[in-house]
Amino acid sequence: MKKILFLAALLLAALDAVAQPADSLAQGERRSNQNVLLNASSDSMPRVISLGIPQWGTAILEDGLPAAMYNDFFPAFWTWRSGLGTETMELTRLDESALQLGDIGFYPMSTSKVGAAKTEAAVSYTVNHFGRNQIDINFASPLGGGWGMNLNVYQDLNRGSNHLDLTYLQEHIRFYKAGISKRFSDGGRFFATWQYARRLSLGDPYGPFIFVGDGTVEPYGDFRLGYDQYLPATASFEYVDIVDGQRKSRRFVEDGGLGMHILTAGFERTLAGGAKFSLGTRVRLAHCDLTEAMLGSIENAGLLSGYGYADGTPYVGKVQTRYMLYYQDDCNEWLSTATLAGRRGKSSWTLGANAWLNWSDNHVMTTNFAYEARKDPQALRYNGRLFYVPNTGAQYFKGSQGRYAVFGQNQWSFSPRLMLRAGLRAEYSHIGGDAAYALEGLEANGRYEGWSLVSPGVTLTPVSVDNLNGAATLVALYRINAAWGLELDAVATRQHSELWQYEEETPPSDLPKDNLLVRGGVNFKNGWLDFQSMLSWYRQNNNYYVGLWTHELTKPAGGYPAGYNESIFISSRYSMEVLSWTTDALVNAGDFHFHGLLTLRSPRYSDYRFQPRFSDGFSETFDFSGKYITGTPAVELELEPSYSPGKWRFWASARYYSRQYVNITNSLYFSPRWETFAGADFALSDKVGFSLNIVNFLNQKGASAGIQAASLADDPTPFRNYLTAGTYLRPRTVEFSTTLRF
């Protein structure tokens, strides 16, 4: 009852004169899509718009609802894409994401095409020179009486640039979507869509290279990053099922993938007093059968190391180890959001509520495998096994999480010069289910080689966790004159651990993750220039992270020999602080347009301490407070010109990222890099269009690696001219697209 009263009190606080931004003051809040679909690392997911604090993946709002409840565990891009079936797409404001999602970020926000005033069809076909084929087909038509329908089919058959013997298609995505809509005479609207999605993703964007030590890399032998495969042609894998403890086999291609059904419905109507009401709901039923092969270390194998070929011949040479996670998950969601918005004089108000539920049955099995560290490698056995030391990192959780929130936003237009907007979100979260935690008295739940739920003494642990989350936002715009203005934003959120974080050997901390972002600056706008310069401070407390840390064993332990670089997962909490200065400008001069962005920042860890314990008994407390955040550049620069003469459009996008630290000790780093794109579009008519695009036209490698052996190293000397493996940018890729409209 106290929680309900708390939520009600916050909602009542938001009822006083809620408002929308006045048009005359909107110059400080421009939206765009920031070329969010131009991702140099992946051709199937949006890029993350960085605020200086790392995050994996991005939230996505589709038709007023999250495409997925979580960004990490079941990322939103698995069910979403922007194409012919998309009506509009832009980015959320920071206060929008905080109030609607409880998170801070610039996230894609799209609406789907459902119905049309007249019958229309469109087909888009894209091919690249590596053999990727995409087809997007959309058909929409009125049905009479205000009813309409829409059909969309999307197929992506992607061979990847480093063709794998394991599979012909590294990624095969199939979306089938059908929808109906009804428009009422009073302007109201109803729509419903059903989508079936099937996704198989076996891409492996990894390769070996020489880390020189000065931030640069050199090729390893004849291996070509982005072009050569770094996986053996092993069609299946072995694992120990954590449910029954049996050793089983699974095929990567035939038995893998993600399948889901998604039903979405929405209703919008203007009420008698002029207020606008909207209600949206989405149900997703999904089953995942996925593998993730994380890079381990590259080792020197001798005659007695235990590595050998299938015929028993010992192997001597470089060995690449991989740590594989196999997910068998049912991940289902029911998400509903309702909003009510109205106006009163020069003010307007918005109120909303979320009821989001995820129920999942998650089994994560782990194992290891190894192969020759070279291109087109052969698989190696370790002590006679192709897949060895299973389930030392096994995870299990069966249960649900409900998130129930109310939010409101107020805006006051005090004068043509001054606007103030404030918002609140209050959220109650409940997580319940069963896990297998290695707590005091439950030591048998501790993971070891071959562990399962039927191992001796293993006991399930009931989980019941209640938390209060929330957000508060404040935006102030002051117009100095017709061109100049001032802007101040403040956004605060509180979050707690999510359902998927309860799968591990130990429960996550119950401490909240608090985010506070404050920024302020000036903006300028005239007929050809839109300019904004902002200084921001962003702090995130109690950040939850599961890190992979490496230590060279001093004696045989855990099923590994002495000298083996053992990698273990350790969960920890820490804080991060980022002080940034960002200048953003849009230039519009006739057929020429230019977007430029420069960010200078100082990203650092704080309150970062943890104590790993390895199989040989080694344990030490590490403190990395004050270190630069790994993988986060201090300087980012974006240059995006375009020129549109007649039926042509020529464009380019170049992003510069300064030095990025490899390890948390900041002893190793990678040199600056450019991510580049360019293209030309030609509209033959309003029915036929062609596009030629080039990804990474500078063909930079952009190699990056965690160098696990150096994860806790202070001395960079042992890692000069060091053989390692990591990721890279997509190699230079030429794409050609044709779009036909009927």
What spans do the regions from the language model cover?
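C-terminal beta-signal and adjacent terminal beta-strands/loops
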Residues: 4, 8, 20-24, 658-661, ...
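Acidic, small-polar-rich N-terminal luminal/periplasmic segments of exported/outer-membrane proteins
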Residues: 20-118
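Transmembrane beta-barrel wall of Gram-negative outer-membrane proteins
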Residues: 120-122, 126-157, 164-228, 263-266
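Outer-membrane beta-barrel proteins
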Residues: 126-134, 156-185, 201, 236-266, ...
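Acidic/polar loop-and-plug regions of large Gram-negative outer-membrane beta-barrel proteins
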Residues: 189-262, 292-323, 376-391, 399, ...
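Surface-exposed loop/turn segments flanking beta-strands in extracellular/periplasmic regions
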Residues: 212-223, 298-314, 363-393, 439-456, ...
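Face-selective signature of the C-terminal outer-membrane beta-barrel domain
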Residues: 258-289, 314-443, 467, 471-493, ...
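Gram-negative outer-membrane beta-barrel transporters
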Residues: 416, 525-664, 686-687, 737-741
